[in-house]
């Protein structure tokens, strides 16, 4: 997917992801996921739908405060902190709510202060009505993509390798329902 950086008048970097005219719904889906995500994480990475140089796409503020090992691709679930597990539960609620089943380990990033952010919700609503809310559901397997990190984490919990508090998930569901 095409991506490019833009700098705003304040010197902040933004990642622009243009989409083809037939795929404008993807950009709108990303912004919708951000707006819903703010209900449970006011610090969610800002995403907007925008037209730049005649091209529609989504644009998100670029994070500059990330840890050196900023994503979870090399993090086994048993090495997660309890705070990371709780934040991953929060992002799981959002991704299931918007039917985004592409939340693999590279789409969860962590800041130096320990905050976990879910990014790249470009598949939001893609499988809505056809999806299966199961930790075994992995529709992007056919594309050779990693499974959603949530599947990996919750399978580790099922196997007794990590612990998580279901009340955390319930709290985030209730926050969205308000």
Q: Where is each model-derived feature located?
A:
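Conserved ATP-binding subdomain of kinase catalytic cores across diverse folds
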Residues: 1-71, 95, 99-100
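Conserved kinase catalytic-core segment
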Residues: 34, 39-42, 76-131
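Charged, low-complexity, helix-prone segments enriched in Lys/Glu/Asp/Gln
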Residues: 26, 92, 172-176
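Charged, low-complexity surface segments at secondary-structure and domain boundaries
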Residues: 73-78, 158-159
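C-terminal catalytic region of ATP-dependent kinase domains
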Residues: 111, 115-178
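Poly-acidic low-complexity segments
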Residues: 2, 84, 98, 163-165, ...
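A short, charged
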Residues: 44-47, 102-103, 107, 155, ...
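Conserved aromatic-histidine-acidic binding/catalytic patches
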Residues: 21, 25, 80-81, 85, ...
